[in-house]
Regions:
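Structural core segment of the AMP-binding/adenylate-forming
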Residues: 9-82
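Conserved pre-ATP/AMP-binding loop-to-beta segment of ANL
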Residues: 88-109, 116, 141-147
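Short hydrophobic alpha-helices that are characteristic scaffold elements of the AMP-binding
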Residues: 4-12, 32, 156, 167
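Structural motif detector for alpha-helix initiation sites
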Residues: 78-81, 101, 124
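Conserved sugar-transfer catalytic core signal across GT-A, GT-B, and GT-C glycosyltransferases
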Residues: 3, 106, 162
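Conserved S/T- and glycine-rich ATP-binding loop of Class I adenylate-forming
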Residues: 7, 38, 104, 110-113, ...
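Conserved AMP-binding A3 loop
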Residues: 105-131
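Conserved AMP-binding/adenylation subdomain of ANL enzymes
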Residues: 128-167
Length: 167
């Protein structure tokens, strides 16, 4: 959730991926969307991606939540602790992004059960529309302090609605 919102506030487009993807699936997805930054949760996920990262010049930074022991691309690598210890420079502060409702917010890929995964672009307005409808439907179910429990990954479009509904 934090990464998703931070990327959107930086005027970026998020591309959540299933943790169950194989290296081949990740290679396809990365080639298709050509991200400049990849955020990885742990060493296990990093191991699935490290060969792909080394081969792609369009990947400028790799950010990990856990410190990775062996990294072949030190000039691209940042761990979350090193990012949070730095003071924000003026250029890092949030600016007016002039986003439109039809501006892309994220690309969600299908699970690829019928072939290669297909990327679907969700706009900021589309997410807002889903959120407004979901909040209206959920009104009778929500008390003063709702608790949400979901098993959906962020790479599922409904999870985007649920994560923002909590805010």
């Amino acid at each position: 959730l934090i990464s998703d919102i931070a990327i959107m506030l930086a005027n970026g487009i998020t591309v959540p991926a299933y943790t169950t993807y194989t290296e081949k699936d990740y290679k396809y997805l990365i080639e298709d969307c050509q991200p400049s930054v990849i955020i990885v949760s742990n060493d296990e996920m990093h191991n699935k991606l490290k060969n792909i990262i080394n081969e792609r010049s369009f990947i400028k930074k790799v950010i990990t939540f856990e410190k990775i022991k062996k990294v072949d691309y030190k000039n691209k690598y940042l761990d979350f602790d090193s990012i949070t210890k730095n003071d924000l420079q003026e250029s890092d502060k949030i600016k007016n992004l002039n986003l439109k409702r039809n501006s892309p917010a994220c690309i969600i890929y299908t699970s690829g059960t019928g072939g290669d995964p297909k990327g679907v672009i969700l706009s900021h307005g589309g997410i807002l529309n889903n959120l407004e409808g979901a909040c209206e439907i959920m009104k009778p179910l929500i008390d003063k302090r709702p608790i949400f429990l979901t098993w959906l990954p962020l790479s599922h479009s409904y999870e985007h609605t649920v994560q923002f509904a909590q805010i």
